[in-house]
Design a protein with these regions (language model features):
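Membrane-interface helix-boundary motifs at transmembrane edges
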Residues: 15-22, 68-82, 123-130, 219
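Short helix-capping and inter-helix turn/linker motifs at the boundaries of alpha-helical repeat units
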Residues: 107-109, 190
Length: 230
């Protein structure tokens, strides 16, 4: 049927647009994450806090690797790696470095929703169990760290002087990443609604016409009819 062919072509077109949009969102979030980690790597290097420096270098390397995967068109794998980074990075910092105090609350857990939303966008285009597990874990960890001051016994709290401005930087970066993902999600919804709107508009304007095309056998005898909607 002509309509089915139209729908298939439109779906391919919309899927290509959605893939492009989620790729842009993933690249933007990963680049922001890399810049954030590099900033603190340099800062803590001057402060000679080598344990945090090594941690930041590891997460920066993983983020660069995820960006590389996306550039070679392994989009799902790249986003999955970046989602792992956006899960492990906040959890490690919440347990070891980002210890809540009376003057400064914990902020590292704010990166967890960014990873969950990015993972959800990827799950919509390429569902898999690991992606879903990471989304659930990210949400659960965000809830846990939001309502708890739990840290490890051997935690190494950051100095109050660092947290005074570092917290605002982390909040701003996490919020920016969340906003980017939400914006792309909104664009996806608009794309999906566009096809529905086109069909409704065509129906309201009575632009569809019904045709009957005869079906014949080898003896050229009519044995039925094919209904076409144009």
């Amino acid at each position: 049927m002509v309509v089915l062919s139209y729908l298939k072509n439109q779906n391919k077109h919309f899927n290509a647009i959605k893939n492009q949009q989620i790729t842009i969102a993933a690249k933007a979030n990963i680049v922001i994450c890399i810049a954030f980690c590099l900033f603190w790597t340099i800062y803590f290097s001057f402060a000679e806090m080598w344990f945090i420096v090594c941690t930041d270098i590891f997460f920066t390397t993983m983020s660069i690797f995820s960006l590389f995967l996306i550039y070679i068109h392994r989009i799902s794998a790249g986003i999955l790696v970046s989602q792992i980074v956006l899960f492990v990075f906040p959890v490690v910092f919440c347990l070891i470095f980002d210890v809540a105090t009376i003057d400064h609350p914990r902020v590292a857990h704010l990166f967890l929703p960014a990873g969950a939303i990015l993972g959800y966008l990827n799950y919509r285009r390429d569902p898999n169990a690991l992606q879903l597990i990471l989304i659930i874990l990210s949400i659960a960890a965000f809830i846990f760290f939001s309502g708890s001051a739990f840290t490890l016994d051997g935690a190494i709290p950051l100095a109050e002087s660092i947290r005074a401005y570092g917290g605002w930087i982390a909040i701003s970066v996490a919020t920016l990443m969340i906003c980017i993902s939400i914006f792309v999600m909104q664009l996806e919804l608009q794309i999906e609604n566009k096809l529905v709107q086109d069909l409704r508009l065509a129906l309201s304007k009575q632009q569809f016409e019904l045709f009957y095309q005869p079906q014949v056998n080898s003896c050229e005898k009519i044995i039925g009819a094919e209904i076409l909607l144009r």
